[in-house]
């Protein structure tokens, strides 16, 4: 398993470690963890106490991929987003996960639909647009004709629709084949789009 458990002790350890390294490097390092699943408000409180900067916070992901009770998780998300908004924590949403399980061209509209839903749910909870890390991912087949232009168009569309949001743009994973040269090119194209549409 990757990552760390979402406990207050782990949040404290990570914050202290990143502050130490940040002091050595002369810059601030953000700490990110997840605030999802069955304990969203509780995790949001712990993250706020320990000074986390970013939290993955998306009930729709749990409904679609984990079969979590819809009503309960949407209420949990509402409470956790109130807490994250008050604490100044940026939330990340999970739209990139849709594209790892579906064709990124055929399902492109689902990402925008989910972003729009997540934006409205965040606004209802009082979360400012500047704290909405709405999700997207660079997951189209790299062999697709004009695929780079489609990726650029999708990213630019998200930037124009959500101009104040610190969008979460995820790098390519599904079509990383082990061809190192091609993988570096895919990462470079992803970075280029991220910079162009910032």
Where are these regions (language model features)?
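Anaerobic metallocofactor- and corrinoid-dependent redox/one-carbon enzyme cores
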Residues: 1-198
């Amino acid at each position: 398993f990757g990552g760390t458990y979402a406990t207050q002790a782990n949040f404290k350890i990570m914050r202290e470690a990143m502050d130490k390294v940040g002091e050595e490097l002369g810059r601030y390092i953000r700490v990110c963890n997840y605030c999802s699943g069955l304990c969203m408000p509780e995790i949001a409180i712990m993250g706020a106490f320990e000074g986390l900067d970013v939290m993955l916070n998306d009930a729709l992901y749990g409904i679609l991929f984990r079969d979590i009770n819809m009503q309960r998780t949407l209420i949990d998300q509402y409470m956790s987003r109130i807490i994250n908004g008050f604490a100044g924590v940026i939330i990340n949403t999970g739209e990139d996960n849709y594209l790892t399980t579906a064709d990124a061209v055929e399902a492109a509209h689902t990402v925008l639909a989910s972003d729009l839903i997540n934006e409205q749910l965040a606004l209802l909870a009082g979360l400012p647009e500047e704290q909405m890390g709405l999700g997207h991912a660079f997951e189209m087949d790299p062999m697709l004709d004009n695929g780079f232009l489609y990726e650029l168009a999708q990213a630019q569309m998200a930037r124009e629709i959500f101009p104040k949001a610190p969008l979460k743009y995820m790098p390519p994973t599904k079509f990383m084949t082990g061809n190192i040269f091609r993988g570096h090119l895919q990462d470079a194209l992803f970075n280029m789009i991220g910079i162009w549409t910032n």
